[in-house]
């Protein structure tokens, strides 16, 4: 997922995406704790994707406030 695709989404879609990423991040951390996680890079990717979504949400909020 890249920032260009995220900017095309609505605020509600971004919030849904953020909720999904948080769930995914939780599941990945849980798998790591139980020793079932094979691809540890997924944790970093999920965290960065969540940060991208939050950044776009903040940009949209700032644009709406102006």
UniProtKB/Swiss-Prot annotation:
Positions of disulphide bridges: none
GO BP term, example: translation
GO molecular function, one term: structural constituent of ribosome
Keywords: Ribonucleoprotein, Ribosomal protein
InterPro entries listed in its UniProt record: Ribosomal_protein_uL29 (IPR050063), Ribosomal_uL29 (IPR001854), Ribosomal_uL29_sf (IPR036049)
Top-level taxon of the source organism: Bacteria
GN (gene name): rpmC
GO CC, alphabetical: cytosolic large ribosomal subunit
Family: Belongs to the universal ribosomal protein uL29 family.
Lineage of the organism: Bacteria, Pseudomonadati, Pseudomonadota, Alphaproteobacteria, Rhodobacterales
Family matches, as CDD domains: Ribosomal_L29_HIP (cd00427)
Protein name: Large ribosomal subunit protein uL29
Organism of origin: Ruegeria sp. (strain TM1040)
């Amino acid at each position: 997922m890249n920032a260009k695709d995220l900017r095309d989404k609505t605020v509600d879609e971004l919030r849904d995406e953020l909720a999904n990423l948080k769930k995914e991040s939780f599941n990945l951390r849980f798998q790591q704790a139980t020793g079932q996680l094979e691809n540890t890079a997924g944790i970093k990717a999920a965290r960065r994707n969540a940060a991208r979504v939050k950044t776009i949400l903040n940009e949209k909020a700032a644009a709406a406030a102006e």
